[in-house]
Amino acid sequence: MAGRRSRNNDITVDILLRAYSAGLFPMADSADDPELFWVEPEIRGIIPLDDFHVSKSLAKAMRKKPFAIRFNTAFEDVMAGCAAEAADRPSTWINATIRRLYTELHQIGHAHSVEAWEGDELVGGLYGVSLGAAFFGESMFSRRTNASKICLVHLVERLNAKGFVLLDTQFTTEHLKTFGAIDVPKLDYARMLDLAVNRPSLQF
């Protein structure tokens, strides 16, 4: 199924949740692409929730409390921030269909945002999908130094407090590896995923 393309009206939130439970997730080639395709990596990125790393410099920055951190108060704005072009991200895989589908997931309690606020301004955030005891990180953005990093720290704290057992990052990057992200072969990931998604759904 990896790489199979679907027209906009082919995918519902029910199909999307079933895909996540099977280890697949959708992407678009660009924001203007009318189609989605399913991705099933041979090597999957995860952050072990019991081995999350916070650098000394980030911990020092967090002690200054530069942002107010909120959850699920501006989900669509976080998606818009993640979809916006930036100097380090000239294009995006988040198209209108993805924004609609994940907003619907948010409305039924399966997609969530972590937000960094500076006064009344949203300056960073991330969003992802919860299913069972798994959380699938989708994208993040930052308009201030460390904003998305601090959101990630708060996400992990919340997942641990709520009893989640899997934080899926889809792929690893050098940035995520500084937090402890590792690569997991598909078969190993499938076992971890099965254990996580077949638990009763946890409240985020």
UniProtKB/Swiss-Prot annotation:
| Name of this chain's protein | Leucyl/phenylalanyl-tRNA--protein transferase
The beginning of the lineage is: Bacteria, Pseudomonadati, Pseudomonadota, Alphaproteobacteria, Hyphomicrobiales
- What does the record give as the reaction this protein catalyses? N-terminal L-lysyl-[protein] + L-leucyl-tRNA(Leu) = N-terminal L-leucyl-L-lysyl-[protein] + tRNA(Leu) + H(+); N-terminal L-arginyl-[protein] + L-leucyl-tRNA(Leu) = N-terminal L-leucyl-L-arginyl-[protein] + tRNA(Leu) + H(+); L-phenylalanyl-tRNA(Phe) + an N-terminal L-alpha-aminoacyl-[protein] = an N-terminal L-phenylalanyl-L-alpha-aminoacyl-[protein] + tRNA(Phe)
The organism's superkingdom is given as: Bacteria
Q: Name one GO biological process term.
A: protein catabolic process
Subcellular localization, per the record?
Cytoplasm
Q: Where are the transmembrane segments?
A: none
- InterPro entries under this entry? Acyl_CoA_acyltransferase, Leu/Phe-tRNA_Trfase, Leu/Phe-tRNA_Trfase_C
What family is this protein classified in? Belongs to the L/F-transferase family.
EC primary class: transferase
Cross-referenced NCBIfam families, in alphabetical order? Answer: aat
What main location does UniProt list? cytoplasm
| Matches recorded under SUPFAM superfamilies | Acyl-CoA N-acyltransferases (Nat)
EC number of this enzyme? 2.3.2.6
Q: Which UniProt keywords apply?
A: Acyltransferase, Cytoplasm, Transferase
- Describe its function: Functions in the N-end rule pathway of protein degradation where it conjugates Leu, Phe and, less efficiently, Met from aminoacyl-tRNAs to the N-termini of proteins containing an N-terminal arginine or lysine.
